[in-house]
Regions:
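Sec-dependent signal peptide recognition
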Residues: 2-9
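C-terminal motif of bacterial Sec signal peptides marking the signal peptidase cleavage site
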Residues: 13-15
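Residue-level signal for mature regions of secreted extracellular proteins and peptides
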Residues: 9-10, 163
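Compact, glycine-rich, soluble single-domain proteins
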Residues: 17-175
Length: 175
Protein backbone atom coordinates (compact mmCIF):
# COMPACT_ATOMS: atom_id res chain seq x y z
CA UNK A 1 0.00 0.00 0.00
CA UNK A 2 2.89 2.40 0.72
CA UNK A 3 4.28 1.80 -2.74
CA UNK A 4 0.87 2.68 -4.29
CA UNK A 5 0.63 5.84 -2.17
CA UNK A 6 4.13 6.88 -3.19
CA UNK A 7 3.28 6.38 -6.86
CA UNK A 8 0.11 8.46 -6.47
CA UNK A 9 2.01 11.28 -4.74
CA UNK A 10 4.73 11.19 -7.40
CA UNK A 11 2.07 11.23 -10.13
CA UNK A 12 0.35 14.24 -8.56
CA UNK A 13 3.63 16.12 -8.23
CA UNK A 14 4.52 15.38 -11.86
CA UNK A 15 1.06 16.46 -13.04
CA UNK A 16 1.27 19.75 -11.14
CA UNK A 17 4.82 20.47 -12.24
CA UNK A 18 5.29 23.75 -14.09
CA UNK A 19 7.78 22.35 -16.58
CA UNK A 20 6.12 22.02 -19.98
CA UNK A 21 5.70 18.64 -21.59
CA UNK A 22 6.73 18.04 -25.20
CA UNK A 23 3.08 18.46 -26.22
CA UNK A 24 2.86 21.81 -24.39
CA UNK A 25 6.00 23.07 -26.12
CA UNK A 26 4.26 22.50 -29.46
CA UNK A 27 0.98 24.15 -28.39
CA UNK A 28 1.77 27.63 -29.79
CA UNK A 29 2.55 26.09 -33.18
CA UNK A 30 -0.75 24.18 -33.16
CA UNK A 31 -2.66 27.24 -31.99
CA UNK A 32 -1.37 29.39 -34.85
CA UNK A 33 -4.11 29.53 -37.49
CA UNK A 34 -3.40 27.99 -40.87
CA UNK A 35 -3.53 30.45 -43.72
CA UNK A 36 -4.72 30.32 -47.29
CA UNK A 37 -3.13 32.34 -50.11
CA UNK A 38 -5.35 34.81 -51.93
CA UNK A 39 -4.28 36.78 -54.98
CA UNK A 40 -6.09 39.91 -56.11
CA UNK A 41 -5.43 41.22 -59.61
CA UNK A 42 -6.11 44.93 -59.90
CA UNK A 43 -5.25 47.72 -62.34
CA UNK A 44 -2.27 48.51 -60.09
CA UNK A 45 -0.85 44.99 -60.02
CA UNK A 46 -1.15 41.61 -58.37
CA UNK A 47 -1.34 41.45 -54.58
CA UNK A 48 -0.95 38.36 -52.40
CA UNK A 49 -2.51 37.93 -48.98
CA UNK A 50 -2.18 34.99 -46.61
CA UNK A 51 -5.45 34.87 -44.71
CA UNK A 52 -7.19 32.81 -42.07
CA UNK A 53 -10.35 31.01 -43.10
CA UNK A 54 -13.60 31.11 -41.14
CA UNK A 55 -15.16 27.83 -42.26
CA UNK A 56 -17.70 26.97 -39.59
CA UNK A 57 -20.72 29.03 -38.56
CA UNK A 58 -19.04 29.58 -35.18
CA UNK A 59 -15.81 30.81 -36.81
CA UNK A 60 -17.80 33.03 -39.15
CA UNK A 61 -19.77 34.50 -36.26
CA UNK A 62 -16.56 35.38 -34.38
CA UNK A 63 -14.55 36.51 -37.41
CA UNK A 64 -11.92 39.09 -36.46
CA UNK A 65 -13.69 40.22 -33.28
CA UNK A 66 -11.43 41.25 -30.41
CA UNK A 67 -8.28 41.43 -32.58
CA UNK A 68 -6.06 44.40 -31.79
CA UNK A 69 -4.11 44.29 -35.05
CA UNK A 70 -4.03 42.69 -38.45
CA UNK A 71 -0.98 42.16 -40.64
CA UNK A 72 -0.75 44.28 -43.80
CA UNK A 73 -1.07 41.18 -45.98
CA UNK A 74 -3.26 39.18 -43.62
CA UNK A 75 -6.99 38.96 -43.23
CA UNK A 76 -9.85 36.51 -43.02
CA UNK A 77 -11.86 34.74 -45.72
CA UNK A 78 -15.49 33.79 -45.18
CA UNK A 79 -16.39 31.25 -47.89
CA UNK A 80 -20.10 31.01 -48.75
CA UNK A 81 -20.95 27.58 -50.09
CA UNK A 82 -23.49 27.71 -51.57
CA UNK A 83 -23.28 31.41 -52.46
CA UNK A 84 -25.62 33.57 -50.39
CA UNK A 85 -26.39 37.15 -49.49
CA UNK A 86 -24.04 37.88 -46.59
CA UNK A 87 -24.41 40.62 -44.03
CA UNK A 88 -21.62 41.61 -41.63
CA UNK A 89 -21.36 44.05 -38.75
CA UNK A 90 -18.47 45.31 -36.63
CA UNK A 91 -19.87 44.67 -33.13
CA UNK A 92 -16.93 43.71 -30.86
CA UNK A 93 -14.44 44.34 -33.68
CA UNK A 94 -11.67 46.62 -32.39
CA UNK A 95 -9.99 47.63 -35.66
CA UNK A 96 -11.33 49.08 -38.94
CA UNK A 97 -11.67 46.57 -41.76
CA UNK A 98 -12.07 46.59 -45.52
CA UNK A 99 -14.79 44.09 -46.52
CA UNK A 100 -14.62 42.70 -50.05
CA UNK A 101 -17.74 40.84 -51.20
CA UNK A 102 -16.76 38.42 -54.00
CA UNK A 103 -19.04 37.40 -56.91
CA UNK A 104 -19.08 33.77 -58.01
CA UNK A 105 -17.03 34.84 -61.07
CA UNK A 106 -14.21 36.02 -58.75
CA UNK A 107 -14.78 39.76 -59.14
CA UNK A 108 -15.26 42.12 -56.23
CA UNK A 109 -18.99 42.89 -56.20
CA UNK A 110 -18.84 45.41 -53.36
CA UNK A 111 -16.05 46.91 -51.26
CA UNK A 112 -16.82 48.50 -47.90
CA UNK A 113 -13.70 50.48 -47.01
CA UNK A 114 -12.74 51.14 -43.39
CA UNK A 115 -15.81 49.65 -41.73
CA UNK A 116 -15.98 51.34 -38.34
CA UNK A 117 -15.12 49.38 -35.18
CA UNK A 118 -18.08 48.54 -32.91
CA UNK A 119 -20.66 49.53 -35.55
CA UNK A 120 -23.90 47.56 -35.52
CA UNK A 121 -24.87 48.80 -38.99
CA UNK A 122 -25.04 45.77 -41.32
CA UNK A 123 -22.77 45.75 -44.38
CA UNK A 124 -23.85 43.70 -47.39
CA UNK A 125 -23.45 43.56 -51.16
CA UNK A 126 -27.19 42.84 -51.36
CA UNK A 127 -26.61 39.91 -53.72
CA UNK A 128 -25.41 36.31 -53.28
CA UNK A 129 -21.62 36.10 -53.02
CA UNK A 130 -19.07 33.28 -53.07
CA UNK A 131 -17.10 34.79 -50.19
CA UNK A 132 -16.29 37.84 -48.14
CA UNK A 133 -12.68 38.84 -47.56
CA UNK A 134 -11.76 41.10 -44.65
CA UNK A 135 -8.49 43.04 -44.80
CA UNK A 136 -6.90 45.64 -42.57
CA UNK A 137 -8.86 48.89 -42.89
CA UNK A 138 -7.50 51.09 -45.68
CA UNK A 139 -5.41 48.34 -47.26
CA UNK A 140 -7.54 48.12 -50.41
CA UNK A 141 -7.07 51.85 -51.07
CA UNK A 142 -3.32 51.60 -50.37
CA UNK A 143 -3.02 48.93 -53.08
CA UNK A 144 -5.56 50.38 -55.51
CA UNK A 145 -7.95 47.44 -55.09
CA UNK A 146 -11.46 48.26 -56.28
CA UNK A 147 -14.82 46.77 -57.22
CA UNK A 148 -14.46 44.68 -60.38
CA UNK A 149 -10.95 43.45 -59.51
CA UNK A 150 -10.52 39.67 -59.61
CA UNK A 151 -9.62 37.19 -56.85
CA UNK A 152 -8.50 33.57 -56.67
CA UNK A 153 -7.42 31.54 -53.67
CA UNK A 154 -5.81 28.30 -52.66
CA UNK A 155 -3.93 26.41 -55.36
CA UNK A 156 -5.58 28.54 -58.04
CA UNK A 157 -4.04 31.70 -56.59
CA UNK A 158 -0.50 30.33 -56.48
CA UNK A 159 -0.40 27.47 -58.97
CA UNK A 160 3.40 27.19 -58.65
CA UNK A 161 3.05 26.28 -54.95
CA UNK A 162 1.70 22.99 -53.64
CA UNK A 163 -1.31 23.97 -51.55
CA UNK A 164 -3.07 21.19 -49.65
CA UNK A 165 -6.61 22.50 -49.31
CA UNK A 166 -10.14 21.81 -50.41
CA UNK A 167 -10.73 25.57 -50.69
CA UNK A 168 -9.50 26.24 -54.20
CA UNK A 169 -11.38 29.05 -55.91
CA UNK A 170 -10.60 29.14 -59.61
CA UNK A 171 -12.85 31.59 -61.45
CA UNK A 172 -12.54 31.77 -65.23
CA UNK A 173 -10.18 34.46 -66.49
CA UNK A 174 -11.84 37.68 -67.63
CA UNK A 175 -12.66 37.77 -71.31
Amino acid sequence: MNRLAALLVFGLIAACSSSPSAADKDAPARAAPATLPIVIRSAKGTHRFDVEVARTPQEQEKGLMFRKELAADGGMLFPMNPPRTASFWMKDTLIPLDMLFVHTDGTIAFLQANAQPYSRVPVSAGIPVAAVLELRGGRAAELGIAEGDRLAWGGCAVSQEKIATDLNFCPSPAN
